[in-house]
């Protein structure tokens, strides 16, 4: 509170007080301007002085005369005390500087001088109202949680305990004045720090609130927000931004306080501001709610202390006896100072006269401030009610001051005193010294300041108007027409000539008119610039760029509607307007700091856009899909029980994390969302017919079909009419048996079902084309069907609950040469239609083609190296080798310097080595790097001393001089086509040299594996590889390829290339010639794989041209395109072209090669690829494909190299497959039960195994109904325990008999193996099945039996049992003679005759045997199947021969004591020939003819088999580890031979096999071993 004291009429007292007041006047002179100007710019600044108001009462006339007399006395003594005064002033300056600096840094937020009120008070009231609402919501939440709510006043600006803490508001030296202080302090606003303990955000973190109310969300979080890449939420980012703004605000305040004008007698040293600058800085918002100081007395209160932490309050009372032209200034003092220290000013300033200032201050306010002070105060100093009412009117006395510089100029000018006396102006004396008269320039500044209105209108902006730079002027000129030229050089603030026309006596109004005119021009330019249209650069979701012309009044929502409609329309390749259903709601707009822009935000109110425009830059915004910022975990799409099923089928899904994983999950989520309308239910999937693409078999006899009628419980046998369809057959059957008994039912209500299988026969298809019917016809058996009521397609629930709609995905395009102008949705606008994006402010990335320097990588160091890898502590060194590969081609190789670890490093358990060495690949630049290049890295130790890198290159990895430590492959790009930059931590795969075809993923056991740290070179922007589909026009390409080839030599060249097998290689000269003739090669589409191998991938222009050719290449046949998917072809575009060709495959054709397609997923560098999308979509839409897809992936899930990629694909399939996930869970439970039993019986003795196995089977709980994993068309409800047994072999497989849910069906016989790797059997049987289909397409049915086989896990799987069959070993033993029966001729013929009594049946069985024997002779020879003894060959009772147990293939025959046990090309023993009637019989000739025909048919499709084997190199099969293992196929297929030569070759092989005795001898020893 201000303590007021009445004036005294005693002249002595007046003179005393006047001198005392004048003592501080000069030192505080600059403080007046500094503090008040700072207060006008920032409402929260704290005043460092108190200004006691100017009194203009008539009662002070006498005091004025006394003051004049006293001033004359002081003038006489001035010269005597000059030196003393200078010392005192200097001391005051140094001490008060310290006080001022400390007070300025520690000042309180509340106003402590004269009751000044903060201008932000009205903002605090709004904040307090919002906090009251928040307080109520918090209290309700505590009630719901049953918790006690501790109420806290979170309001801003008011102290809750102000009544109890009176000292915080002010104090008084006497008891009589304390009451007034308490009353005023109780309502005084105090800025307080907001307590956030009870806030909504904090409650959410504690888990008490799941969702924040819309009222308390910021504009960014009110809509969808994208999670920050650094795991910082939008709310945290907003909080950080607010803190940053507050910090900048405080910095600006400090800078404003330091801006002062030099008050000096020498006008040349005075800093003169431009009038517009002065008006700009001084025309700030005034504190209209300030509490004024009284006119006669003042109480100064200090709320902070420098030396003590507890503030105390002191009050000093002075009486104003000066005239109306005088100003009394009271400085703030520290409570720890004594009275003498309190009289010192906070900042010492040069002594200068102030009479001109006094005149300017008193003149405009004399009429408004003439009030009686003596009547308004009491002797005790308390204020009256009238005084309280007039506080607001009196608050203007200390509000209008000018900015001045704070300088330490103590010089005086005696001439100023004479000038002041001549002009009859009052001279204020300080300590007996006349003050210096202000200079003319200073008077001009003061004159400008005091002519500003009391409450000038100001714009409510955070920042004052800034001066325009030359760049901004130029920017405005380009936007605004030349109606208002920018003539004012407003950035030249030091030009004093602008003030030369002004004199000290010039009126303020004339000057303000001129300065306002120049300022008006600037302001009008800015206003016009805001209203003028401007451009915004949008970065679209497909990485394309678009320019949109907008206005400042546009909102973000309007921009989004315009840009999205244009984006979807121009990217709709089919022009069918399918994209129209997706609106702007599917997208979000972000600024380039990844902050979401509020939908209702006006562009002129966006700080980001305004800042960019002020800098003359084009604003850049990002358009993203909403799905990209949502959580990629789709667990919310399923019920908890359904999600638990997925967790059981694929454990450990939560451990798969990372940016690429989250991106791939979003990709698969989009894919299943798009496929949702096409997903079929359970019944619909079951009713799908299975038609065979093979020719209809021709039989001489009638085809009989057995049908069971459940209603009448009768079995009927009908003849199949010629070309009769399934619907016609059903109608004939219904009419004959049911039409009379069921008059209200027609044949469409029934359907035929295969007994024992889930195959249905219906539709307008020839009944012989159904796969199940065709197999029965080929095998000569009678099909068994049942007539059932047609199942009604049940309303299956959706497989998942969609969370949002995905907009169409568009091709990524980083091309930025042209942009589409979206001005008013008119793409043909001539304004900015073709915009050059080469401007630096519009660059968002760097093209790899622009970096013209060698590629390099820095090897930092390696950790956790096992000591076992270091053979010799003294001489062994550790080396890192890095090779640059593209496919299987190595471009460059580099080595680090060998590092010998110091001896003390071996004291730890593991070893660490540091290189910090750049490896430069001098032969290839960044600009020529292939996008799919990879680094193959090896870390190994040299067992001998190695001096330099050249010696390392001479070492062979296969020698014993090198010990492998670990290896890994790293792509040079990431999944976004961005070049890797910065540090990369790698976890190596152990104990092997580099494998260029191996995985590119890290070892998941990173805590135990060897670590390697690399550093890739960093650039200022992301470095991207071009992904545009259209070929660059900068390269010369023949757009129209030649229509024919006139040169026979050229034609022969292409025919030779296409005739080569995929395993053969060409010389480099041939590849160069092929690339030279690339424009003609399009006439031979099959040459594409070789053409892609001839591309010089280290030449950027050649790569662009190859991609352009690929875009125009004719589509290949599906099987021909498989070669483009093996490891040799690494380019993504090439592999995507191959997948496009596979779209034409039928269901059965896709199932035939699905195993290979799943395996080549390992060759894909990243999770997301066109192949993975293709397979996932096919699996979702077809349950048969989905079943095989699931188990092919599940069987390799144990491999740590593949677990993440295969696991995410499985997870995505299970989310979309609906009820099929329940069936898969049942199958897995059955397999787990069988695996447990199979492992338990192995350590038991033979006599105990069966009894233990039966007990275990009886204790197991089987699902009520489940489909067999081996064949999902078979359905069972349990195990027939009495018929189950274990087999007498090394791995003890289980022979199991499952029940069939069909009443009249036979049991389902399978062999379950635990401990055998069935992947090789799967591959071999797949090839045999494929050969059988190829032969049947050519009309050759060789009666093969490619039984089913599937691997369900690590060394676990199932095999189908061929019923009514026996091994040739048992057949030979049944004839007697023991092991010698292996040399007998008739045992096999006698066994067939025994089961086919009649002559017709026997001849038919013999013919079947000849056909099947021919087929397996060709198949086993071509595939190089080994370990062929009489226990691996079986014959059915119908004479069908087949092979089992394919543990060796590709020519890997067994050896005994270093000798090959198998020397015959294939198994064809004399007893086989005996069944045919001998070598001279006609049937033997038939056999030879069948073999040669089958062999030539297979040779025509040799490329298919070679490609399928090549695609399986990465599976890890022991006998298929590298491409060299496939060399046997080149010999066995003999593609270079003609059909006649090949026929002669195979005839010779038949006779060679028949004459070789080692086969019979091998059978003999096998008999002995198993006797």
UniProtKB/Swiss-Prot annotation:
The UniProt record lists the keyword Transferase: yes
GO biological process annotation, one example: G protein-coupled receptor signaling pathway
Region of interest (Disordered), residue spans: 1-119, 157-195, 283-430
Sequence ranges assigned to domain C2 PI3K-type in this UniProt record: 851-1020
Alphabetic keyword roster: ATP-binding, Kinase, Nucleotide-binding, Transferase
Family: Belongs to the PI3/PI4-kinase family.
Name by which UniProt lists this protein: Phosphatidylinositol 3-kinase 1
Residue span of region G-loop: 1286-1292
Protein EC: 2.7.1.137
Molecular-function GO term, any one: adenylate cyclase activator activity
Residues annotated as domain PI3K-ABD: 530-627
GO cellular component, one term: cytoplasm
Spans annotated as Catalytic loop: 1424-1432
Reactions mediated catalytically: a 1,2-diacyl-sn-glycero-3-phospho-(1D-myo-inositol) + ATP = a 1,2-diacyl-sn-glycero-3-phospho-(1D-myo-inositol-3-phosphate) + ADP + H(+)
PANTHER family (alphabetical): LD28067P, PHOSPHATIDYLINOSITOL KINASE
Domain named PI3K-RBD: residues: 700-789
Domain PI3K/PI4K catalytic, first and last residues per copy: 1280-1558
Biased composition (Basic and acidic residues): 74-85, 283-292
